[in-house]
UniProtKB/Swiss-Prot annotation:
Protein name as catalogued: Anthranilate synthase component 1
Binding site for chorismate: G273, T274, Y388, R408, G422, A423, G424
Keywords: Amino-acid biosynthesis, Aromatic amino acid biosynthesis, Lyase, Magnesium, Metal-binding, Tryptophan biosynthesis
Single biological process term from Gene Ontology: L-tryptophan biosynthetic process
Subunit structure: Heterotetramer consisting of two non-identical subunits: a beta subunit (TrpG) and a large alpha subunit (TrpE).
Reaction(s) catalysed by this chain's protein: chorismate + L-glutamine = anthranilate + pyruvate + L-glutamate + H(+)
Entries under Pfam families matching the protein: Anth_synt_I_N (PF04715), Chorismate_bind (PF00425)
Length: 461
């Protein structure tokens, strides 16, 4: 395609103006209803050590979508389309890699659908209902540094601070969300049958593991920020997000990083092995000890750490891949997980787009070997995953990137919202237990929906 938008847009030196620090969500509520497209990427404290920055963006310069071999550029006034054999190769035309450290300094913010894996590996996946990717090019926004307590307006193109300043002091009440369950894509019986089919493939030696998911669709009306407000209250995570790009919105509380690139250091935190939280700290400890002595969970985690090491090794300098943290317990509101930390250093000639492609999709939402596991998932689940199990985050103009795995999320298109969760299937999996794991992972989302409003007939206004 050969598009270079920075031949059209004048990229200025970074402008930074300090603002009074307020809670990111309170600021976002003031901005959300004023713009058709906006985002909040919010880090909230947990014992993972990942919470660092939060970002708000609004009304991007353009939105870039890829679907069916075509890239569409929508600047709000007009749309252009270009044929593209591999849209991720062409995505670099919307980035200007600058040598400048420090998180996000303007760039692409959006999501990548699970179906986009076919551009990174030789695999056949069906077309989804969502674009393969959808990013806004955001050249200004608000940055919150939770370590220093600083808040700043940052800009690389123009100055829209006067436009939003009148909004920033507003106290905006949250509305309510009306919802109605429309359909569950898989019954409990069908999900357990899928587990048995996957175990048969494992016994035949095709794979070691496959992550099978179940989804439920809801009809929605009202204030979707009410759902996010409830979710951040009961399930704070290092990766909280509310992304609105026109008619598509993704709201989530992901515990798991897909990949981060900062100053050419690449890292990921594979999570595998799950138990519910206890009612007390002592009960938490007992449950965690049981988790760390479960041979099935440990074998699954080791497999996924090895997969992460291999993925990162594809784009890292020889000998630079390390595992500085291995099989530690990390706790969230409703569940606790086994977590490890895998790092590497990007080798010369590689960038954040290469790093993203090397690890996408995460082994923790696909399986091992990854390609064959994904083919089996496609045949068993029967419907495209779309944004679920893909990635959401940013590619910064300075070459940095930070993406969460799109799990523990509600994915909305129009009036429909979908909640989806999965479990890793191995040779000794018990179908009933795997089904319950999916339910445990979705519990915080369902509770958030209940807190945000009430079950109604959304078409009865």
């Amino acid at each position: 395609m050969g598009v270079n938008v920075f031949g059209i847009i004048n990229l200025e030196k970074p402008r930074k103006e300090k603002l009074e620090f307020r809670e990111p969500f309170e600021v976002f509520k003031s901005i959300y209803s004023e713009y058709e497209s906006s985002f909040l990427l919010e880090s909230m404290e947990s014992d993972t050590g990942l919470a660092r920055y939060s970002f708000i963006g609004f009304e991007p310069e353009m939105i870039i979508r890829a679907r069916e071999g075509v890239i569409e550029i929508d600047d709000g006034d007009s749309r252009e389309e270009f044929d593209s054999k591999n849209p991720f190769e062409d995505l670099r035309g919307f980035l200007k890699m600058e040598k400048n450290s420090g998180g996000f300094c303007g760039g692409l913010v959006g999501y990548i659908s699970y179906q986009a894996a076919r551009f990174f590996d030789t695999i056949r996946l069906s077309e989804g209902d969502f674009p393969d990717f959808e990013f806004g090019l955001f050249l200004d926004g608000i940055m919150f540094n939770h370590l220093t307590g600083e808040c700043s307006y940052i800009s690389r193109h123009g100055n829209r601070l006067p436009d939003i300043s009148p909004l920033l002091g507003d106290e905006v009440p949250t509305g309510t969300l009306g919802y109605r369950r429309e359909r569950t894509l898989l019954s409990k019986r069908r999900y357990m049958d899928m587990v048995l089919e996957a175990k048969e493939r494992i016994r035949e030696g095709e794979i070691f593991q496959a992550v099978l998911s179940s989804a439920t669709d809801y009809r929605l009306r009202g204030d979707r920020l009410a759902f996010y407000e409830s979710l951040r209250r009961i399930n704070p995570s290092p990766y909280m997000y509310h992304l609105k790009l026109g008619e598509r919105e993704i709201t989530g509380s992901s515990p798991e990083m897909l990949v981060r690139v900062e100053d050419r250091r690449i890292e990921t935190f594979p999570i595998a092995g799950t138990r519910p939280r206890g009612r007390t700290e002592e009960e938490d400890g007992v449950i965690a000890s049981d988790l760390l002595s479960d041979e099935k969970e440990l074998a699954e985690h080791l497999m996924l750490v090895d997969l992460a090491r291999n993925d990162i090794g594809r784009v890292s300098e020889f000998g630079s891949v390390e595992v500085p943290e291995y099989m530690t317990i990390k706790r969230f509101s409703h569940v606790q997980h086994i977590l490890s930390h895998v790092t590497g250093k990007l080798r010369d000639g590689m960038d954040a787009v290469d790093a993203l492609g090397a690890v996408f999709p995460a082994g923790t939402v696909s399986g091992a070997p990854k390609i064959r596991a994904m083919e089996i998932i496609e045949s068993l689940e029967g419907v495209p995953r779309n944004a679920y199990a893909g990635a959401l985050g940013y590619l910064s103009l300075n070459g940095n990137a930070d993406f969460a795995i799109t799990i523990r999320s509600m994915v909305c298109q129009g009036k429909t919202g979908r909640i989806q969760a999965g479990a890793g299937i191995v040779h000794d999996s018990i179908p009933e237990m795997e089904y319950l794991e999916c339910q445990n992972k979705a519990r915080a989302l369902l509770k958030s929906m209940e807190m945000a409003g009430e079950q109604v007939d959304p078409d009865n206004r």
